[in-house]
From Swiss-Prot:
Annotated HAMAP family: Ribosomal_eL32
Keyword Ribonucleoprotein: yes
NCBIfam families xrefs: PRK08562.1
SMART domains in the record: Ribosomal_L32e
UniProt similarity note: Belongs to the eukaryotic ribosomal protein eL32 family.
A Pfam family hit: Ribosomal_L32e
PANTHER family linked: 60S RIBOSOMAL PROTEIN L32 AND DNA-DIRECTED RNA POLYMERASE II, SUBUNIT N, RIBOSOMAL PROTEIN L32
Keyword terms, alphabetized: Ribonucleoprotein, Ribosomal protein
GO molecular function: structural constituent of ribosome
Cellular component aspect of the GO annotation: cytosolic large ribosomal subunit
Protein name stated in the entry: Large ribosomal subunit protein eL32
Record InterPro entries: Ribosomal_eL32 (IPR001515), Ribosomal_eL32_arc (IPR023654), Ribosomal_eL32_CS (IPR018263), Ribosomal_eL32_sf (IPR036351)
């Protein structure tokens, strides 16, 4: 990883630490309301009008730097694999694989072995048995 990417990963880590947990308005009052973020749209809504004690709004400034957005913390781009044939399409210099959950233990072991031969990083190898 080049020094600029490493710096941007550190910036992303700091920004994620400062980011508040965005919660839906009044989700603490009603059991039927999930905590999942929904933009407040009420005309008199305190959260929409940015009252300090009512929780933060999701805004552009909380985002990660564009160069490292969506990357795995290891610095690799995440690629979902569900067959051995898909391994040939992966570039090991900047991509790492994640084996699909529907894959059984035997096929997963084969994919991991082929990935090691090709020098590809596996993000979810599981327990070795």
């Amino acid at each position: 990883m080049d020094p600029e990417s490493r710096r941007l990963f550190n910036v992303r880590k700091v920004l994620k630490g400062k980011k508040p947990q965005f919660k839906r308005t009044c989700s603490h009052k009603f059991k039927k309301l999930d905590d999942n973020w929904r933009r407040p749209r009420g005309s008199q809504g305190k959260q929409r009008r940015k009252y300090a004690a009512k929780g933060a709004l999701a805004q552009v400034g909380y985002g990660s730097p564009a160069a490292v957005k969506g990357l795995h913390p290891s610095g690799y781009s995440d690629v979902l694999i569900s067959s051995i044939a898909e391994l040939e399409l992966v570039d090991p210099s900047f991509e790492a694989i994640r084996i699909a959950g529907k894959i059984g233990a035997k096929k997963k072991a084969l994919i991991i072995a082929k990935a090691e031969e090709a020098g590809i990083k596996v993000l979810n190898p599981g327990r070795s048995e």
